[in-house]
């Protein structure tokens, strides 16, 4: 082993040790129902439910959208950078509900991937956030990368010292006093982008346990709603 500050020298051989076990089994088809909103010979649009992972990863090797797609379709194309993810050209977070486009042919895969890369597609999401958002609309810019305190979560790095560029445009749809319904349009597609960006500007997503959205912060103007909100959480 070497120290974290060790500088590699030319000609040295580096061996990496992975903390997680390697998944050797191939992706298998699973009879999981999918909600198809649209389908033709080239693509399909599905309504992804909450609490469902898009593709296999550490801790989630079964019960994913990818497993379900293999059952419903034969010979789905794969992107080189999306290994083991048949027909998938974009992703949604596990707890996000929304429409996903699935490519059924190689040509559709190439064209759809290019559209997402060139940012000619529009991705809009509705989110209920804590607080009365100050501006009717706004733009959040800040690199997003793994949190240094919790690797499962993402953090915003405004100075661009870490993470990848991320841009979220938001617009207020309705104000409820202690919460606000906003529409978020993404220019980039980073993991937990909306969740991390909205928390960054002080408006965590309602009931987002991972980012602190399940509680009202002490000392805020919303503390008086604490009992009411706690009762709401009991009903969720």
Please report, for each region that a protein language model flagged, where it lies by residue.
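RNA pseudouridine synthases
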Residues: 1-236
């Amino acid at each position: 082993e070497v120290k974290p500050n060790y500088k590699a020298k030319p000609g040295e051989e580096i061996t990496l040790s992975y903390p997680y076990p390697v998944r050797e089994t191939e992706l298998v088809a699973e009879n999981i129902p999918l909600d198809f909103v649209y389908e033709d010979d080239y693509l399909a649009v599905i309504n992804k439910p909450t609490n469902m992972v898009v593709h296999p990863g550490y801790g989630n090797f079964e019960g994913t959208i990818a497993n379900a797609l293999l059952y419903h379709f034969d010979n789905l194309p794969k992107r080189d950078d999306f290994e083991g993810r048949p027909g998938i050209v974009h992703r949604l977070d596990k707890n996000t509900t929304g429409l996903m486009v699935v490519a059924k042919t190689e040509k559709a895969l190439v064209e759809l991937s290019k559209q997402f890369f060139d940012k000619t597609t529009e991705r809009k999401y509705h989110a209920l956030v804590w607080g009365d958002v100050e501006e009717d609309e706004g733009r959040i810019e800040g690199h997003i990368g793994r949190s240094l305190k919790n690797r499962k979560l993402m953090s915003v790095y405004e100075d661009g010292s870490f993470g990848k560029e991320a841009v979220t445009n938001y617009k207020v749809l309705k104000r409820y006093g202690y919460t606000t319904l906003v529409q978020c349009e993404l220019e980039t597609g980073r993991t937990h982008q909306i969740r991390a960006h909205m928390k960054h500007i002080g408006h965590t997503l309602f009931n987002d346990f991972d980012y602190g959205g399940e509680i009202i912060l002490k000392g805020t103007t919303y503390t008086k709603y604490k009992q009411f909100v706690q009762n709401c959480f009991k009903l969720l």
